[in-house]
Amino acid sequence: MKLGLMAGDIVAAAELRDLGFEAVQMFFHGGANGDSGDPKPADIDAVLNAGNTALAAMTLHADLVGPQGAIQADIERTIRCVKKTAALKGRFGANPKPVLVWHPSGYPDAPQVDDRAVFEGLCQALTPICAAATELDVQIAVEITRAGSVGSAETFLHLKDRIGSPALGVCLDAANFVPDRTPLERAVRALGPHTVIAHGKDSCFRDNGEVDTYGPIGSGRLDYDTYIKCLLAHTPVPYFVFEYYKTRDDLLRARDTVRAAMGAASVLSQR
């Protein structure tokens, strides 16, 4: 499992390899009408070449569903991003195929939300998206997040059963839904065969059990020794991508925490 990070300027590109980071994750512009804001292949190449890094994944933030079901404009936008991701083939390093992370926006919020329609809308939206991904040899990775329309391991597995596409996988960021939605070890074990990429950040909780804040690895309560051990044991992910760091020191502390957990897991596996 190689280390990556979100594209940005916290660390100079020329330092990335020396600091142990081999890939960056980049973003399409969010929303249904974001095409004009998307990076061009030349823009992406400039970032990758500056750090001699691979592209861990492209990312799209989009709703796909509203209170009454699927949003056609978001579906069409996501399919366009699938095509743009496919056009970046050859840049994705250790990934067996191009990866598009879909990050759901917040769970539809309205006085008359039809929860069944939300789930059916997800199925309606993801079916043509996955068909396009299959045709173009792209892997879709759904980022499970407690505030979004795919909020637990169980919800993803229900979607996977309904859609039945090998193109539908998971972006596993445990801080997004553990332990209040799905317990940590169960989450990684259940999602392991479907996990395409993993993320690293941390989360703190209020007394009532709701999430309070997100931050860099080490700033919250996630058990990183267990998280990394389970990722190595149960998933085939090529890249573990760091996020929510605000400073260079944040990032390097997070890197050292993950490296230590990887070392401990390696020792355990040899016993």
Residue ranges of each PLM-predicted region?
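A generic structural signal for short
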Residues: M1-K2, A32-N33, G69-A70, A117-V118, ...
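Histidine-acidic metal/acid-base catalytic patches
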Residues: K2, D9-G20, G51, D74-K84, ...
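Structural detector of well-ordered beta-strand residues that form the stable sheet scaffold
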Residues: G4, A56, L100-V101, A141, ...
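Active-site beta-loop-alpha junctions enriched in small/polar residues
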Residues: M6-I10, F27-G31, L60-D63, S105-Y107, ...
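Structural motif corresponding to the early beta-alpha repeats
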Residues: E22, M26-G121, N176, V237-Y239
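Hydrophobic alpha-helical segments and helix-packing faces
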Residues: F119-L122, S149-A153, L184
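Histidine/acidic residue-rich metal-binding segments in metalloenzymes
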Residues: C123-A131
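Basic- and aromatic-lined ligand-binding clefts that recognize polyanionic substrates
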Residues: E135-I163
